[in-house]
């Protein structure tokens, strides 16, 4: 058992190269909170990339500018206050103990019940810091040895490479898309649910959106349809469509699917993610596509519910929903034969490495010959290279080559470095 003596939080704001568009909105910076913990003489610090727009658009709309980030940071601070003096056997015990009080705290700050993903997003750094001190205490050097017994059957892969999933948001140019295809990309994540400039949710907004989405997918398809890849089962570049809950009805979704069929891209669609907002519980199992749950799935109960609604894949986001919750989610998903993948949240390099560790043991998608992972921070942060310098000394980053990250023994044995001292300690000065 470990006892938590100290749990502190700091934060830094990281600018984005250009406005980052999704869910019909745009971001210009991402706050990085940093949690530092001390447990029985063991220390760890971990960042958390805050994404208010992704985790709860209602908070983003109600509290514009930096106010939403301030609320999420306050939730992290409240968690740290609660954790001091607590003891735990394994870190995954802590989140269930924190959630009820943190939901009440967020309600006090916002005046409404926030999405559970908002709370989980705030806890990513705290959760990884707790796993880090736990690994230090138990001498764990490989991620596979950190995986709880309950998740071991679900995480029995050992990928030697991970296909990189780049993010093709609204503003990515034709030249860049062509370059991605020609340099080895096998699975492109394409943002749909385009903003229309009209009243959000109105009939005009929805109709313009679906027309823009069809045009966008068609333009991308025409750029890369003749490029082959050894990383997919059919040898073609595949598309992962992420609507972030923008679609309003099944009829509107069917308009999109008809457009995809007409352009001859049906066999390219690997995943369609979150076409509808969480409260629109439409059954999608009748369509010949794999629908993927992301922000609507933040617990085992949510995963089971989405599977009943016809969803056949789940986006694991250890770097957004916490490592602890992701262990539970992959277990529930794989028990039902559901596909999984590790998606990004435009996180910093440190969290990207944790995501790689999780992805390296997660089963490959049915359309892929290798595992896969989404990483897009290097294309979006102005200070990506400076943030890489905050990684632990001696930690070797596996770089992309021909569309995939090559994983070796140094990577698989690198957890002891990843859980040790890193550059994020500097945000706390001398304690």
Where in the sequence are the language-model features?
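Glycine-enriched alpha-helix->loop->beta-strand junction motifs that scaffold or abut catalytic
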Residues: 182-186, 261-268, 286-292, 305-315, ...
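Metal- or metallocofactor-binding catalytic centers and their adjacent structured scaffolds
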Residues: 38, 45-138
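Flexible C-terminal active-site loop/helix
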Residues: 346-431
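Histidine/acidic-residue-rich catalytic or RNA/ligand-binding cores of hydrolases
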Residues: 55-56, 307, 325-329, 351-361
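A general structural motif
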Residues: 272-276, 293-300, 319-325
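Metal-dependent enolase-superfamily TIM-barrel catalytic cores that perform enediolate-based chemistry
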Residues: 148-279
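Short, Gly/Pro- and small/polar-rich lid/capping loops
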Residues: 1-36
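Conserved, mostly hydrophobic/aromatic
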Residues: 35, 41, 126, 139, ...
């Amino acid at each position: 058992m470990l006892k938590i003596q100290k749990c502190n939080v700091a934060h830094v704001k990281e600018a984005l190269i250009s406005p980052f568009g999704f869910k019909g909105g745009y971001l210009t910076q991402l706050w990085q909170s940093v949690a530092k913990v001390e447990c029985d003489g063991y220390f760890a610090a971990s960042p958390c990339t805050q994404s208010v727009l992704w985790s709860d658009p209602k908070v983003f709309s109600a509290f514009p500018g930096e106010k939403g980030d301030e609320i999420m940071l306050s939730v992290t601070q409240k968690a740290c206050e609660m954790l001091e003096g607590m003891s735990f056997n394994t870190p995954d015990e802590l989140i269930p103990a924190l959630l009820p009080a943190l939901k009440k705290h967020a309600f006090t700050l916002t005046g409404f019940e926030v999405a559970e993903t908002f709370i989980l997003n705030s806890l990513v750094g705290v959760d990884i810091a707790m796993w880090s001190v736990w690994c230090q205490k138990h001498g764990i050097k490989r991620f596979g040895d950190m995986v709880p017994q309950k998740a071991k059957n679900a995480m029995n892969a050992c990928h030697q490479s991970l296909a990189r999933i780049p993010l093709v948001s609204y503003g990515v140019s034709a030249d860049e898309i062509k370059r991605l295809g020609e340099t080895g990309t096998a699975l492109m994540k394409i943002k749909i649910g385009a903003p229309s400039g009209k009243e959000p949710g109105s009939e005009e907004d929805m109709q313009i959106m679906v027309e823009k989405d069809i045009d966008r997918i068609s333009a991308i398809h025409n750029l890369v349809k003749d490029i082959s890849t050894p990383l997919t089962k059919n040898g073609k570049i595949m598309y992962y469509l992420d609507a972030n809950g923008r679609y309003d009805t099944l009829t509107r979704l069917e308009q999109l699917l008809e457009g995809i069929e007409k352009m001859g891209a049906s066999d390219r669609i690997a995943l369609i993610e979150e076409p509808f907002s969480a409260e629109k519980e439409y059954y999608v199992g009748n369509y010949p596509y794999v629908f993927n749950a992301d922000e609507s799935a933040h617990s085992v109960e949510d995963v089971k519910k989405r599977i009943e609604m016809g969803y056949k894949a789940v986006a694991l986001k250890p770097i957004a929903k916490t490592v602890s919750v992701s262990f539970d989610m992959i277990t529930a998903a794989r028990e039902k034969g559901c596909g999984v993948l590790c998606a990004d949240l435009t996180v910093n390099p440190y969290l990207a490495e944790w995501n790689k560790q999780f992805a390296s043991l997660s089963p490959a998608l049915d359309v892929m010959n290798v595992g896969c992972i989404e990483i897009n921070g290097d294309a979006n942060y102005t200070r990506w290279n400076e943030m890489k310098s905050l990684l632990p000394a001696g930690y070797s980053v596996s770089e992309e080559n021909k569309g995939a990250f090559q994983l070796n023994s140094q990577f698989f044995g690198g957890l002891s470095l990843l859980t040790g001292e890193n550059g994020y300690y500097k945000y706390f000065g001398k304690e």
